[in-house]
Each structure stands twice: as C-alpha cells, then as structure tokens.
C-alpha cells in the first residue's frame, strides 16, 4: 500500500508512516538494548525489498545503516576489531552512495567509481605488485583512508555530503528501495515472469 501511495503521490509517504516507522525502530531498540545513532551501543539496520513475489537481485538493498564517523568507533570497540568496523562503514558508504545518492559509473567510464578508488589506492600502496591485490591486505588506517576518499567522491558526484544522521540514512534508503521497484532490471524481470507492476513492494527494515 505504501509503495502504491509513493508512486501515486510524487514519491511521498502517507502521514502516518513516520510515526509507525519510529515506533517499530523503538521496539527493536528495546528488544536488542541498542539505539539508532547511540555512541556506545548503536543499532545497525538493513533495508531491503519485501516484494510479494521473489525477485532475486533485482531490487536494491542497504546494509549497516546507522554507521557514521562516531558510531563506527562504537562498533570497533564492541566487536574488538577496528578493521572490521571501518570496512563495514566503507561498504555502507559505497552501497548508500550508489543506491541512494546515484554515485554510479558515468558514460565513458569503464569501472564503478568506488571500485576505481580501491584499485587506484592499492596500486599506490603496492606499486611493484602485479595482478589483483586482495582487499584484506589493507590495514585499518588504510581502510580509513578509503572511507575518506569515498566520502569525497560522494560529495563531488552527488553535490552533497554523505549523511551522518541515521534517520536521514534510513529515509533515504526506504525511498531508494521503493524507487528500485521501477528500475530497468526490475521492469524487465517482471515482464519476463508476469509479475504485475501494480503489486508494488514492501520495504523490510531489520536489525543487522
């Protein structure tokens, strides 16, 4: 119903939706003892499609929502693995930048811009090595540098900063998943398998 409303009302939401989402997030926070944006025990979320009929790989997904320059430090502490935390953050920026902010390969570019940054940086770090260099060879400070370069790319391509507010991240992600219902690959898939566009999709928000 929300998806149908979204497309019928210039990609806006029913007035009751924000209250319902906030109430659902609050219940999840209480159950897990974590809080969205908290600096000690941050709640991280995934946002993905809940289409009536399975459409594997066709719809957009966001993982590790809730990470920013502060909550990533809390994840590093709670996990005992700073590199893991910063790599989650790096991947979140890449995913959000692509899906929500439209930072994608431009006409004439051979590679995804985020992947190009990774490859170029690894060439800087390991200039004498040939062939593919495993991302796992990057240490935490080097992953932090990727985060910085990713955010600079988002600013340059999207014209705005990567959002640090988890609620802004959440609403951006919800809109992107609804928007992906009508993307080219989803339309082609529905035509092939006889899935009506009028069905729309749910958006599932879950704890990581």
Across the structure, where does each feature detected by a protein language model lie?
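Nucleotide/phosphate-binding sheet-loop regions of phosphoryl- and nucleotidyl-transfer enzymes
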Residues: 1-208
């Amino acid at each position: 119903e929300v998806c149908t409303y979204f497309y019928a009302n210039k990609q806006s939401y029913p007035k009751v939706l924000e209250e319902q989402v906030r109430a659902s997030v609050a219940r999840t926070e209480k159950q897990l003892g974590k809080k969205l944006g908290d600096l000690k025990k941050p709640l991280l979320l995934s946002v993905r499609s809940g289409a009536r009929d399975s459409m594997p790989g066709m719809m957009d997904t966001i993982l590790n929502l809730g990470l920013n320059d502060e909550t990533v430090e809390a994840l590093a502490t709670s996990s005992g693995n700073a590199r893991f935390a910063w790599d989650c953050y790096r991947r979140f920026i890449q995913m959000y930048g692509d899906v929500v902010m439209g930072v994608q390969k431009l006409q004439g570019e051979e590679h995804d811009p985020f992947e190009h940054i990774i490859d170029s940086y690894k060439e800087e770090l390991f200039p004498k090595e040939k062939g593919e260099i495993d991302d796992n060879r990057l240490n935490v400070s080097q992953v932090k540098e990727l985060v910085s370069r990713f955010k600079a790319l988002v600013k340059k391509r999207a014209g705005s900063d990567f959002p640090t507010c988890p609620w802004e991240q959440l609403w951006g992600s919800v809109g992107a998943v609804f928007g992906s219902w009508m993307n080219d690959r989803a339309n082609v898939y529905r035509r092939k398998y006889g899935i009506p566009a009028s069905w729309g999709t749910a958006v599932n928000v879950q704890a990581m």
